[in-house]
Amino acid sequence: MFPSRHLFLFLVLVFCFTQVHGVTSYSVDEQENISIYAKSSRAVVNISNIAVNYDFYYRAIPAESGSGTGFLINKSGIIVTNYHVVENASKLVVTLSDNSQWPGKLVGADPNNDLAIVRIRAPAESYGVLKFSHSNDIVVGQKVLALGNPFGLRQTLTTGIISALGRTIAAKNGRKIEGIIQTDAAINPGNSGGPLLDSDGNVIGINTAIIGSAGSVGIGFAVPSNTALRILPDLLKYGYVRRPWLGIEPIPTVYLRRIGIDIQEGLLIARVVNGASADNAGLRGASETVKVGRYKVPWGGDIITHINETPVASMEDLAQQIETRKSGEKVTVRFIRLKKVHSVVVELVLRPRS
């Protein structure tokens, strides 16, 4: 009896051991990745940019000129992506995670921040949505996940960390995008416009660029979510971002110093637009043109050196201090006129659409 009993217990233990080890176990980190992918992937889409070419007989020949990623943010079919993904598109085709395809309509675009909004008319139950988190709360070293369609390989998940904050990169139109998130999560061509997620599965950035044309080398960039949250209302309502301006044509004095002119660092006002903020505040543009060597230089205008105590010496400095504000806000402009330092309070107005 005892041998039989011992044999029975032995077989039970072997069976339990086999069952336990036959079940795949995942680490806490792996479980988190799996959960985020399961919850988020239905909100991520592929966007094909279809251009139209014409043959010898002027017959239209559609051709895919590029593709990228986007993600849905509500059940009205609103998709966030990069501007360069949809730029110059004759037709947009959006592919959902269930492989269904829908025509996309460009709702709004902001080339300065490389962001755009596309809308589809698909059944709400056919896709998921993602929520934004505030990028002001993120820190270097925290875990991030990138979802996208690199090289056309749809629904690809990569992981990494935030490598740095506050980077500056150039948009395709040459304007500087500031406050950029740097990550080592693998980002490749086709990932553009996809979400950069935190460990709760919320969007903290929009993947936009990599270093090197051949693909990821461990350095990718994302536009922070707070930038998107700031401009999305304008894109949805107006189709573009309404930005304030001073209404001046400035010349960075660094260029004048290079040709031998002894001048304070700042922005020389070449011209003031009638009725604009600078004009209303009494700022003055150039009163004459002087010749320096073979160059003709506007001269006699005020030289702006600071805005709200922040030095400004380039077009990017000026844009950062003015265009990130709202119409009606007031700023203090410090400037030099006839070798004397002055200050004036300027109330900002919107830049005309034209």
Across the structure, where does each feature detected by a protein language model lie?
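Bacterial N-terminal signal peptides
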Residues: 9-18
